[in-house]
């Protein structure tokens, strides 16, 4: 994510996955901030209050990203009016292609086909024609079966419609790039806040992980001194199962300052 933020700062556009990752961070930031408020209530001030308060969920930005991006594979039709219109035209053109091909498959070309299906080859709608009847179905050959007995032909009747579909696909991709560029610009305006959120969330994650481990180990925070004294109460080796480890008390630096530990040799 830090790499994505650096790219935003130099004016680059982010991909769908990168924008979703930033959106996810901000949504988690919002959840953490809401959790801190619900957990604290009217309790006494906490040492983490400042970190929680510094979090900025940037809700308008996350809302806009979620409105435009449905998943890592799909941009919403509602991302822009242009995209909605382009996709509507693609559907209309696709329906016209299927209507004409269905008429061929179930009508005049039926006896020349290997199978009554409509397929895609090289991004073009085609029908499977028996090789020996190639001349009976005027069109462009885009592929053939492994045995050579079937040719996948794009009938001349739909060449223009297939071209229209291809042009619409290019328009769709161009519009998606515009949408991602716009979202990237909006995100770039908040890079300082996003980076601050990221740093705080990482710190909180470490703090809570340490606290969870401490609770699991029944550990306490040590108090250090510069007098050369060590006093451990009910200490256990942290890497040994706490159910098997025998706690011991250790005192050094008061009555004696030398400790010899003996162990059985197996």
Question: Where are the predicted features?
Answer:
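Conserved, well-structured core domains of diverse proteins
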Residues: 46, 50-54
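Alpha-helical coupling/stalk and coiled-coil linker elements that connect catalytic or binding modules
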Residues: 8-16, 30, 42-46, 62-264
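Hydrophobic, well-structured mid-protein blocks that either form specific transmembrane helices
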Residues: 39
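Amphipathic alpha-helices that form helix-helix packing interfaces
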Residues: 1-4, 8, 22-25, 29-32, ...
């Amino acid at each position: 994510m830090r790499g994505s933020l650096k790219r935003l700062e130099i004016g680059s556009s982010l991909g769908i996955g990168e924008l979703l990752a930033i959106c996810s961070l901000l949504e988690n930031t919002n959840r953490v901030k809401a959790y801190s408020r619900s957990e604290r209530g009217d309790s006494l001030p906490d040492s983490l209050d400042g970190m929680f308060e510094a979090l900025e969920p940037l809700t308008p930005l996350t809302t806009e990203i979620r409105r435009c991006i449905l998943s890592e594979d799909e941009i919403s039709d509602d991302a822009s009016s242009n995209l909605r219109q382009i996709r509507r035209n693609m559907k209309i053109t696709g329906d016209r292609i299927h209507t004409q091909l269905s008429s061929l498959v179930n009508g005049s070309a039926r006896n020349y086909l290997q199978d009554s299906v409509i397929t895609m080859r090289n991004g073009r709608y085609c029908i499977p024609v028996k090789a020996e009847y190639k001349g009976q179905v005027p069109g462009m050959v885009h592929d053939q079966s492994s045995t050579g007995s079937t040719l996948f032909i794009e009938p001349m009747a739909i060449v223009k419609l297939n071209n229209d579909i291809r042009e619409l696909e290019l328009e769709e991709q161009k519009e998606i790039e515009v949408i991602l560029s716009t979202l990237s610009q909006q995100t770039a305006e908040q890079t300082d806040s996003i980076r601050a959120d990221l740093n705080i969330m990482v710190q909180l994650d470490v703090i809570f992980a340490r606290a969870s481990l401490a609770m699991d180990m029944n550990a306490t925070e040590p108090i250090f001194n510069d007098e050369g004294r060590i006093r451990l109460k009910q200490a256990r080796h942290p890497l040994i199962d706490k159910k098997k480890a025998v706690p011991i008390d250790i005192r050094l630096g008061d009555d004696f300052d030398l400790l010899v530990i003996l162990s059985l040799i197996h």
